[in-house]
């Protein structure tokens, strides 16, 4: 069964693409009775405020017609930023050699949080270098991941 995020991704990606942007990912967070639907968009050269506004208007119109969210919600559209979340294996592949932070659903070696250099991707496994040791993690066990911004 597909998640709400997966359903929204499928429903909205073409409309976002038609506006010249890539739908990088979607996060849905419930706080009390309200939900926040957060869309991350990206494009070559970076995302502008106007891009976010255009995507927000288009997505709002689609969601009003399709009505896939039963509860009240707020829609947010933004760039993924420097510490961008990673949602898919192809996105992870773009950041091989960089530091990422990962939060797991099920602990590995009694740890849910890992941070290290993304070494490689093989099938559905990612390999991080953590304290000079390889740590292999199953992609399906990753609850949340993001690039670690360096300044």
Curated annotation (Swiss-Prot):
GO biological process, one term: translation
Keyword Cytoplasm (UniProt): yes
Keywords: Cytoplasm, Ribosome biogenesis
Any one GO CC term of the record: cytosol
InterPro entries on file: Ribosome_maturation_RimP, RimP_C, RimP_C_sf, RimP_N, RimP_N_sf
Entry annotated with the keyword Cytoplasm: yes
UniProt main location, coarse: cytoplasm
Localization in the cell: Cytoplasm
Family: Belongs to the RimP family.
Function according to Swiss-Prot or TrEMBL: Required for maturation of 30S ribosomal subunits.
Record's protein name: Ribosome maturation factor RimP
Designated gene of the protein: rimP
